[in-house]
């Protein structure tokens, strides 16, 4: 089913070679809602002096809300700098992958929480979406939903945007988790 061109949805760009700043500036100038957050990090190149540097939380991904037509136009404007994520539709044709509002909201809770121990994955891994689903009911990640998985001998909450990317948290106390039936 092809969606109407004037309907706004969430889409994602894969960003090449650290070209996130000009794309973010474009979105800000055009007033396009987007998610491309940065964190402050101390960077010590030669162990002589450290610099405070802005580092993207998700260096190769920017989420944005716009129409399908505008998303494809932005991709053409930033040729060789970004790639619009695409999936196959019911007619087996590739079209821009629409991301649900709920997935973006939950992913954003975790990605922008500022908690330590977040790991980002450029690829969605369906093997981590088996088992019981949980909701975080307390703490800085309150409202996040995902699967508790074991990675490198640690239990982590795995939150994903299906078919696109994922983030895992550090340790979350069991008292903060509620099983979703």
Residues of each region from the PLM?
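Short coil-to-beta-strand transition motifs
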Residues: 128, 137-144
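Acidic-enriched and Gly/Ser
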Residues: 1-133, 155-158, 163-178
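Short beta-strand-centered aromatic/proline hotspots
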Residues: 143-151
């Amino acid at each position: 089913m092809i969606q109407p061109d004037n309907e706004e949805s969430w889409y994602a760009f894969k960003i090449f070679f650290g070209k996130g700043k000009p794309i973010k500036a474009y979105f800000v100038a055009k007033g396009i809602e987007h998610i491309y957050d940065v964190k402050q990090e101390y960077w010590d190149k030669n162990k002589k002096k450290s610099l405070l540097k802005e580092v993207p939380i998700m260096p190769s991904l920017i989420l944005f809300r716009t129409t399908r037509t505008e998303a494809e136009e932005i991709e053409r404007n930033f040729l060789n700098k970004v790639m619009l994520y695409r999936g196959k539709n019911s007619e087996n044709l590739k079209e821009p992958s629409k991301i649900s509002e709920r997935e973006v909201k939950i992913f954003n809770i975790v990605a922008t929480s500022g908690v330590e121990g977040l790991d980002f994955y450029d690829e969605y891994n369906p093997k981590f979406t088996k088992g019981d689903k949980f909701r975080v009911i307390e703490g800085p990640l309150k409202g996040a939903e995902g699967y508790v998985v074991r990675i490198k001998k640690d239990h982590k909450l795995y939150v994903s945007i299906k078919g696109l990317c994922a983030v895992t948290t550090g340790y979350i106390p069991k008292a903060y988790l509620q099983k979703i039936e």
